[in-house]
Amino acid sequence: MMDFIRGKGGLVAHLGTSDAREVEKRIADGDERAKLVYDGMLYSAARAISGLAAGADGQVDRVILTGGMAHSRYVVDYLTRKVSFIAPVEVMAGEFELEALAAGACRVLEGKEQMKVFDSYGANA
């Protein structure tokens, strides 16, 4: 179970790799199992995005796809088909989490934005 938790689940468990580029190459080469597993993973991501929209009472201005996998046309096209009914989909490929946190801290320190405090459930306190 610990192996599963520590990165041996998901794509690795099903396809022996965590490299999305390799999985997409296998799909392009006709590997139906790779397509089934990858599409299943993306379907789960689309469901999660939809669930977050429901939690926001549908008040969503944009769905923003970030992270390394947002460089993939396959991923972006799949997720856009599934979630664009919620709001326009925007792609900001790459991993910008630390930059976003730093920029937010600067806005608070400069008095441009109020600091937000979240409780242990992630709700704005």
Regions found by a protein language model. Name each.
Residues 45, 63, 105:
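Hydrophobic, well-ordered secondary-structure elements that form the walls
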Residues 78-87, 112-114:
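A glycine- and small-aliphatic-rich helix-loop capping segment at beta-alpha/alpha-beta transitions
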Residues 11-14, 67-71, 98:
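Short, small-residue-enriched loops and turns at beta-alpha junctions
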Residues 3, 7-58:
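Adenine-nucleotide phosphate-binding core of ATP-dependent small-molecule kinases
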Residues 70, 90-125:
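Glycine-rich phosphate-binding/hydrolytic loop that grips phosphoryl groups
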